[in-house]
């Protein structure tokens, strides 16, 4: 009898075990689609990014013009650029929903998978930041100046570190060229980390909405979840293409249509929408080092969630108190996002400070307390 190549070939066997014959829980919902959607986002960004890099020039005198040239003179250059810019937004929408799913259903108890996931988020944020600088518009330049300057808050070595990162005494040509190099490199680091993420995931298998072991009821990934994932792909790509074709600049900053000018500061410097919640936390502390620490903590706090899990139940499905807190946290992050887009004046300052305080309080204090109380109420 002939050998089944899919199951015996050294490379195909790995693909088969990850995407075809993978045993998956029979009851995972659409919230489990976002992992594969992130994979599609990553592939889309690498393909469109590669095509853009073929026409881009990483030089302060030419960068802005080269992006304009792409949109005007390159076949479908405008579409490739719009897909790449809006693809980043979809990447972040998917990753935030993916993390929210993990928090809600207790997926963070797969510690290795979760920790690699947080590192992936940090790498994605770094990639998006250096990428936003490349068109060399006003917001690109001033965003780079403001964010890189934060490193100067590090005691003793801060200023040296910033000048080393800039390659000079301000954001200039060396900064742009190294940011382009990093923006080209980091997506491939993300690919590598994704493979590690999947390797750890397949050690334990997927979690499920009930938060209980599902070894007694597994189904093959293909055809069940391949079909389910394809539906997600179609919906997400339809939304992405619609955004890129109808309102490509909806999520961008109009300030970036002006070439970078070190002599003119924009009235309101703010990052892209997906960083606004962290930016609001940074701004809400009236001290440079304190703000930088809070900014870092806003993401790094995710590393602590497995350690703060006090509930005897894994998922929040049967924990109404924790559910209320979870949705309060979601609303809180949305408020932070809104505050981050507003000028630094009353009442936004105090709203931002309250929202920042409640963000950390919910994650570090209220979640563990609510879980302990639920254990008591359920007599667990």
From Swiss-Prot:
Its cofactor is heme b. Disulfide bonds: none annotated. Heme b b566 binds at residues 98, 197. GO terms for cellular component: mitochondrial inner membrane; respiratory chain complex III. Keywords: Electron transport, Heme, Iron, Membrane, Metal-binding, Mitochondrion, Mitochondrion inner membrane, Respiratory chain, Transmembrane, Transmembrane helix, Transport, Ubiquinone. The keyword Chaperone does not apply. GO terms for molecular function: metal ion binding; ubiquinol-cytochrome-c reductase activity. CDD domains: cytochrome_b_C, Cytochrome_b_N. The chain crosses the membrane at residues 34-54, 78-99, 114-134, 179-199, 227-247, 289-309, 321-341, 348-368. One of its GO terms (biological process) is mitochondrial electron transport, ubiquinol to cytochrome c. It is a multi-pass membrane protein. The keyword Transmembrane helix applies. Binds 2 heme b groups non-covalently. A ubiquinone binds at residue 202. It is found in: Mitochondrion inner membrane. Heme b b562 binds at residues 84, 183. The cytochrome bc1 complex contains 11 subunits: 3 respiratory subunits (MT-CYB, CYC1 and UQCRFS1), 2 core proteins (UQCRC1 and UQCRC2) and 6 low-molecular weight proteins (UQCRH/QCR6, UQCRB/QCR7, UQCRQ/QCR8, UQCR10/QCR9, UQCR11/QCR10 and a cleavage product of UQCRFS1). This cytochrome bc1 complex then forms a dimer. Belongs to the cytochrome b family. Heme 1 (or BL or b562) is low-potential and absorbs at about 562 nm, and heme 2 (or BH or b566) is high-potential and absorbs at about 566 nm. Component of the ubiquinol-cytochrome c reductase complex (complex III or cytochrome b-c1 complex) that is part of the mitochondrial respiratory chain. The b-c1 complex mediates electron transfer from ubiquinol to cytochrome c. Contributes to the generation of a proton gradient across the mitochondrial membrane that is then used for ATP synthesis. This is Cytochrome b. It comes from Setophaga ruticilla (American redstart).
